[in-house]
């Protein structure tokens, strides 16, 4: 039964459905940390699932490994590929800008929510759950709780994150 509940919870978070069969806020901290990490992965490229997207994470990891390799072997030239096709540096740059913008917006929003006096885990996972379109977070916004505890200002911040997660950041930042 525990395997069933944990598999369902992971599938629910990765698919951004927001369903829960158990209060995973009662799980060990290690399991909760893994769930929060899964929140950021989101769907695959082109999906309406929230999160950073698997393809962007792959590009960021490959770009990071290329940079580390260039420090170890300064004269080496390595192209980053996806599906055996080399990626243009503009795509890598755009992905890096997207990730930096995502993390900046995330950090500023967690700080803005901190004015409510809620604990850090509640604020962090509330922003993570909304920008990644997951549904519930942890602590006071866990699967057995709701977002009604936040002030009107904080709710507007979280609404912006729901839109940013569904529509992606680019269209909202252009507006």
Regions found by a protein language model. Give the residues of each.
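Membrane-proximal intracellular helices of multi-pass ion channels
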Residues: 1-175
């Amino acid at each position: 039964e525990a395997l069933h509940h944990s598999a369902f919870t992971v599938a629910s978070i990765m698919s951004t459905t927001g369903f829960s069969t158990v209060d995973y806020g009662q799980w060990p901290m290690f399991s909760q940390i893994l769930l929060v990490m899964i929140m950021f992965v989101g769907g695959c490229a082109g999906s309406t699932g929230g999160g950073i997207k698997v393809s962007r994470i792959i590009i960021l990891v490959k770009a990071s490994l290329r940079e580390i390799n260039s420090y170890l072997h300064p004269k080496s030239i390595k192209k980053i590929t996806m599906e055996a096709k080399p990626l243009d540096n503009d795509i890598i740059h755009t992905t890096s800008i997207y990730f930096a913008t995502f993390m900046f917006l995330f950090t500023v929003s967690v700080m803005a929510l901190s004015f409510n006096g809620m604990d850090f885990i509640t604020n962090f996972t509330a922003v993570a759950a909304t920008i990644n379109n997951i549904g519930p977070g942890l602590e006071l916004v866990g699967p057995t709780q709701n977002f009604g505890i936040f002030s009107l200002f904080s709710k507007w911040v979280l609404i912006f994150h729901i839109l940013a997660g569904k529509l992606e950041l680019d269209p909202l930042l252009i507006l």
